[in-house]
């Protein structure tokens, strides 16, 4: 009988110890609020610099991305201002203009970019990831409700810093690491449509 009482007491103590040492989960209220705000932003423009690193090449370009709902206009220029690549999506149609002014059309932006440049870029997910939205992938958030990391099977994103924009906190420095390509995005300016 005494053995049963001792075992019951030890079991209760173990449960109490486990409950008291359990880590507190971060308050996700900040993340829910941040996510709802970001999901409501469907029209925006960013300007900044993009470093593109592949096993064969390393380069840096200026980037201007204008998002209008599901459509976008991406402009990559050299540091001197000459066009490297321009890409427009209107409906299902993708148009890419290269540095020589040659137009390429299709419906698969990632395939067109890879075919023309050799760069693997997650074009379809970029509008969401640039804003700091993980979608249905694994992610980590900080206590302020901002995404610090997103992981997919092909890509891992690190959000180093955020900047205040019209009362919002928007990503400023993001690193995208893929199997063969690394992208480092520094956003100098955000414009959010009201």
Curated annotation (Swiss-Prot):
GO terms for biological process: lipoprotein localization to outer membrane; protein transport. A lipid is attached at residue 19 (S-diacylglycerol cysteine). The keyword Magnesium does not apply. Transmembrane segments: none annotated. A lipid is attached at residue 19 (N-palmitoyl cysteine). It is found in: Cell outer membrane. InterPro entries: LolA/LolB/LppX, OM_lipoprot_LolB. It is a lipid-anchor. Keywords: Cell outer membrane, Chaperone, Lipoprotein, Membrane, Palmitate, Protein transport, Signal, Transport. Monomer. Belongs to the LolB family. This is Outer-membrane lipoprotein LolB. It comes from Tolumonas auensis (strain DSM 9187 / NBRC 110442 / TA 4). The gene is lolB.
């Amino acid at each position: 009988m005494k053995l049963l009482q001792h075992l019951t007491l030890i079991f209760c103590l173990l449960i109490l110890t486990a409950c008291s040492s359990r880590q507190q989960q971060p308050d996700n209220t900040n993340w829910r609020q941040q996510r709802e705000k970001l999901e409501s932003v469907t029209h925006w423009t960013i300007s900044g610099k993009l470093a593109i690193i592949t096993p064969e090449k390393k380069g840096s370009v200026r980037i201007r991305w204008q998002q209008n709902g599901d459509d976008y206009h991406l402009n990559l220029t050299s540091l001197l201002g000459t066009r490297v690549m321009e890409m427009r999506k209107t409906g299902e149609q993708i148009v890419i203009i290269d540095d020589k002014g040659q137009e390429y059309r299709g419906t698969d932006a990632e395939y067109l970019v890879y075919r023309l440049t050799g760069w693997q870029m997650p074009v379809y997910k970029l509008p969401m990831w640039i804003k700091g939205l993980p979608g249905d992938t694994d992610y980590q958030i900080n206590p302020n409700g901002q995404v610090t990391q997103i992981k997919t099977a092909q890509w891992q994103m690190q959000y180093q810093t955020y900047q205040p924009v019209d009362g919002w906190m928007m990503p400023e420095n993001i690193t995208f690491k893929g199997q063969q390509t690394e992208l480092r995005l520094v956003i100098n300016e955000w414009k959010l449509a009201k």
